[in-house]
UniProtKB/Swiss-Prot annotation:
Catalyzes the transfer of the diacylglyceryl group from phosphatidylglycerol to the sulfhydryl group of the N-terminal cysteine of a prolipoprotein, the first step in the formation of mature lipoproteins. Residues 349-468 are annotated as: Disordered. One of its GO terms (biological process) is lipoprotein biosynthetic process. This is Phosphatidylglycerol--prolipoprotein diacylglyceryl transferase. Pathway: Protein modification; lipoprotein biosynthesis (diacylglyceryl transfer). Residues 445-455 have a biased composition (Basic and acidic residues). One of its GO terms (molecular function) is phosphatidylglycerol-prolipoprotein diacylglyceryl transferase activity. It is a multi-pass membrane protein. It comes from Mycobacterium tuberculosis (strain ATCC 25177 / H37Ra). Residues 391-406 have a biased composition (Low complexity).
Length: 468
């Protein structure tokens, strides 16, 4: 006795009603896929060092752009259905819930929307693409179930045991047609076809597993994992298109999606080869606002360390017993370094408090552009801190104060090599006197105190950059 093949039955309907509100299976599948992609993408982005929830902020731009792009691609490649002779018209073209999204347009405009979101959040676009790539292909697999409920995008007729039964559906007007979106199955089989939606669903799940394995096995970054996703999907889509028999735009007898799959596959492979190897540093995933917050939190300690380092490099050894630095001078320099360090830390704490919403005075900020505009010559001339002048004046011979002062302020005199300062005699207290800000008649009292906090910080950061 010959057994009849067991075919895969189609769902009896693709839409249900909650009162007057229609619930379409296609829309439910698309929304479910988007949610799954966002959950997976946000978890992966957080694991790479990104801020939790940032994926959802970017999705506010990417998802609408993707839906619009998918619909536009569908209309462009299947325009006869809507705008040809006997077409459904513009109103049907706008009913996106009836189905009809082109993945190529969805990915293209979705990436553009993601780029806008990444710019606003301050993270590189390739980082996000690598994080969401597995979730996107899994979302496509879930979305293919919507084609199953709509009885669309099927292949040629077949006698294979896994063939898909397409039923006649009775639409609200009473006609029995096989492609009615709002109709209910009559139980009568119209034809048996290749379940191309199922082939692509299985392929997308395999691509999802492959991407997860590649990402864990190798160090993939800079958008290369997204390139693998595009290449793998295009290879599978090209094969599936060869089995489809539904109406589509043809070029030289070949479906337009086959051409698209080929060209996009080549572009993805080229990008994988040319893209930088390795993976981005976790700090690049924090976003601009998070990087600023982290920098402000570290600023007090960093600026204090920079102040001490710059003072030490400018003044030289200040320990007791140094031939060029009497103990009183060393103690004076140490005291001034400590005072300035405390001042830097206090001002930085004020900045952190401002960020947290406390009422504090505004502090002048210094941009990187101001620092980079400084010429190397300016850096060399401004590198010594203000207290270096005190140290040099204190280490000079006391018997020649007028000569030193005139050399320091006379711009017409040529520079002469510095002479080693004589060792002061402890028996002569006058030689141990520390020059004060008002000891030099050519230097008004307090002129060294006129630099504000911003100029000191610029000087310290310049010194630090030079040492690095």
């Amino acid at each position: 006795m010959r057994m009849l093949p067991s075919y895969i039955p189609s769902p009896p309907r693709g839409v249900w009603y909650l009162g007057p509100l229609p619930v379409r299976a296609y829309a439910v599948c698309v929304i479910t896929g988007i949610i799954v992609a966002l959950l997976i993408g946000d978890r992966r982005l957080t694991a790479r060092g990104g801020e939790r929830g940032m994926t959802y902020d970017i999705a506010l731009w990417a998802v609408p752009f993707g839906l619009i792009g998918g619909r536009l691609y569908h209309l462009a490649t299947d325009w006869r259905t809507y705008f040809g002779d006997g077409g459904a018209g513009l109103a049907a073209a706008l009913r996106i819930w009836d189905g009809g999204l082109g993945i190529w347009g969805a990915v293209t405009l979705g990436v553009m929307g993601a780029w806008i979101g990444c710019r606003r959040c301050g993270i590189p676009l390739p980082v996000l693409l690598d994080a969401v790539a597995p979730g996107v292909v899994l979302a496509q697999a879930i979305g293919r179930l919507g084609n199953y409920f709509n009885q669309e995008l099927y292949g040629r007729e077949t006698t294979m045991p896994w063939g898909l039964e397409i039923f006649y559906r009775r639409d609200p007007s009473g006609f029995d047609v096989p492609n009615s979106l709002d109709g209910v199955s009559t139980g009568q089989v119209a034809f048996v076809v290749q379940p191309t939606f199922l082939y692509e669903l299985i392929w997308n799940v395999l691509v999802f597993v492959a991407l997860i394995y590649i990402d864990r096995r190798f160090i993939i970054g800079h958008g290369r994992l997204f390139g693998f996703y595009v290449a793998f999907y295009c290879a599978g889509r090209f094969c599936v298109e060869l089995l489809r028999d539904d109406p589509a735009t043809l070029i030289a007898g070949i479906r337009i999606n086959s051409f698209t799959s080929t060209f996009v596959f080549i572009g993805a492979v080229v990008y994988i080869i040319l893209a930088p190897k390795g993976r981005e540093a976790p700090g690049a995933l924090r976003g601009s606002e998070y990087v600023v917050d982290e920098a402000l939190e570290r600023e007090p300690a960093e600026l204090a360390a920079a102040a001490v380092a710059s003072a030490a490099s400018a003044v030289g050894p200040v320990g007791p017993g140094e031939p060029n630095q009497p103990d009183d001078v060393a103690e004076a320099v140490k005291a001034e370094v400590a005072e300035v360090t405390d001042e830097v830390a206090a001002e930085s704490v004020v900045q952190v408090a401002d960020r947290d919403g406390e009422s504090t005075p505004a502090v002048e900020e210094t941009s990187e552009a101001d620092i980079e505009r400084e010429q190397p010559g300016d850096l060399a001339g401004q590198a010594p801190a203000a207290h270096q002048v005190d140290a040099e004046a204190a280490s000079a011979a006391p018997e020649e104060p007028a000569a030193l002062a005139s050399e320091a302020h006379d711009e017409t005199e040529p520079e002469v090599p510095e002479k080693a300062a004589p060792i002061p005699d402890p028996a002569k207290p006058d030689e141990l006197a520390v020059a004060g800000p008002g000891d030099d008649p050519a230097e008004p009292d307090g002129i060294r105190r006129q630099d504000d906090f911003s100029s000191r910080r610029r000087r310290w950061w310049r010194l630090r950059r030079r040492r690095q």
